[in-house]
Amino acid sequence: MNEELSAFFDVPVGTMMLAIAFPAILLPTPNRLITNRWITIQQWLVKLIMKQLLSIHNTKGLSWSLMLITLTLFIGLTNLLGLLPYSFAPTAQLTVNLSMAIPLWTGTVILGFRYKTKISLAHLLPQGTPTFLIPMIIIIETISLLIRPVTLAVRLTANITAGHLLIHLTGTAALTLLSIHSMTITVTFITVVVLTILELAVALIQAYVFALLISLYLHESA
């Protein structure tokens, strides 16, 4: 059992690359004017995501719509991919999530200091701060700014990993209890089904939360 759990985190690079590229297959670019139902659902989903993520932005901020929509769909589909039997979710790896969070966060910081230099610096010192607390507050606000990409990546990794491990442990318990009593396996099976449904919701919610936080960071900067 311990070997199975450790194998969950020890994934070959080739397998990870295939898992990352898989969402592109599920969302093909339509090459004709008359679309089918799948393309219609895809377009409706894109419009819904755009409406939710870009409601706080002005006209200038709308230029980030393609990136935010792509980010949401990519994370959501890779999270759902990990729920399939004998599959792997790239977002369960902290390195993958950091590789998304750090460049996006860096871009928001650069934009902020380029276009809103005074406002970006003002965020490091809240208005009305007592004089003797100014050095400490600046250090605290700077640290809170620098750990943003880490919190983004850790939040996504922790939620996806915890759900997968919980389902794995519950499923293993169901197989172990199978030889004890039939009623026990029934209760455990129902528990696994409920956990899977909850994990479906978590997979989609975490994709939305990740993209929403990036959108909020962009709103502060752009």
UniProtKB/Swiss-Prot annotation:
<feature type="transmembrane region" description="Helical">
    <location>
        <begin position="64"/>
        <end position="84"/>
    </location>
</feature>
<keyword id="KW-0066">ATP synthesis</keyword>
<feature type="transmembrane region" description="Helical">
    <location>
        <begin position="160"/>
        <end position="180"/>
    </location>
</feature>
<keyword id="KW-0496">Mitochondrion</keyword>
<keyword id="KW-0472">Membrane</keyword>
<keyword id="KW-0812">Transmembrane</keyword>
<keyword id="KW-0952">Extinct organism protein</keyword>
<dbReference type="InterPro" id="IPR035908">
    <property type="entry name" value="F0_ATP_A_sf"/>
</dbReference>
<protein>
    <recommendedName>
        <fullName>ATP synthase F(0) complex subunit a</fullName>
    </recommendedName>
</protein>
<dbReference type="GO" id="GO:0046933">
    <property type="term" value="F:proton-transporting ATP synthase activity, rotational mechanism"/>
</dbReference>
<keyword id="KW-0813">Transport</keyword>
<dbReference type="GO" id="GO:0045259">
    <property type="term" value="C:proton-transporting ATP synthase complex"/>
</dbReference>
<feature type="transmembrane region" description="Helical">
    <location>
        <begin position="93"/>
        <end position="113"/>
    </location>
</feature>
<keyword id="KW-0375">Hydrogen ion transport</keyword>
<comment type="similarity">
    <text>Belongs to the ATPase A chain family.</text>
</comment>
<dbReference type="GO" id="GO:0015252">
    <property type="term" value="F:proton channel activity"/>
</dbReference>
<dbReference type="InterPro" id="IPR000568">
    <property type="entry name" value="ATP_synth_F0_asu"/>
</dbReference>
<dbReference type="GO" id="GO:0005743">
    <property type="term" value="C:mitochondrial inner membrane"/>
</dbReference>
<keyword id="KW-0406">Ion transport</keyword>
<feature type="transmembrane region" description="Helical">
    <location>
        <begin position="132"/>
        <end position="152"/>
    </location>
</feature>
<keyword id="KW-0138">CF(0)</keyword>
<comment type="subunit">
    <text>Component of the ATP synthase complex composed at least of ATP5F1A/subunit alpha, ATP5F1B/subunit beta, ATP5MC1/subunit c (homooctomer), MT-ATP6/subunit a, MT-ATP8/subunit 8, ATP5ME/subunit e, ATP5MF/subunit f, ATP5MG/subunit g, ATP5MK/subunit k, ATP5MJ/subunit j, ATP5F1C/subunit gamma, ATP5F1D/subunit delta, ATP5F1E/subunit epsilon, ATP5PF/subunit F6, ATP5PB/subunit b, ATP5PD/subunit d, ATP5PO/subunit OSCP.</text>
</comment>
<dbReference type="Pfam" id="PF00119">
    <property type="entry name" value="ATP-synt_A"/>
</dbReference>
<dbReference type="InterPro" id="IPR045083">
    <property type="entry name" value="ATP_synth_F0_asu_bact/mt"/>
</dbReference>
<dbReference type="GO" id="GO:0015986">
    <property type="term" value="P:proton motive force-driven ATP synthesis"/>
</dbReference>
<feature type="transmembrane region" description="Helical">
    <location>
        <begin position="7"/>
        <end position="27"/>
    </location>
</feature>
<comment type="function">
    <text>Subunit a, of the mitochondrial membrane ATP synthase complex (F(1)F(0) ATP synthase or Complex V) that produces ATP from ADP in the presence of a proton gradient across the membrane which is generated by electron transport complexes of the respiratory chain. ATP synthase complex consist of a soluble F(1) head domain - the catalytic core - and a membrane F(1) domain - the membrane proton channel. These two domains are linked by a central stalk rotating inside the F(1) region and a stationary peripheral stalk.</text>
</comment>
<dbReference type="GO" id="GO:1902600">
    <property type="term" value="P:proton transmembrane transport"/>
</dbReference>
<feature type="transmembrane region" description="Helical">
    <location>
        <begin position="185"/>
        <end position="205"/>
    </location>
</feature>
<keyword id="KW-0999">Mitochondrion inner membrane</keyword>
<keyword id="KW-1133">Transmembrane helix</keyword>
<dbReference type="InterPro" id="IPR023011">
    <property type="entry name" value="ATP_synth_F0_asu_AS"/>
</dbReference>
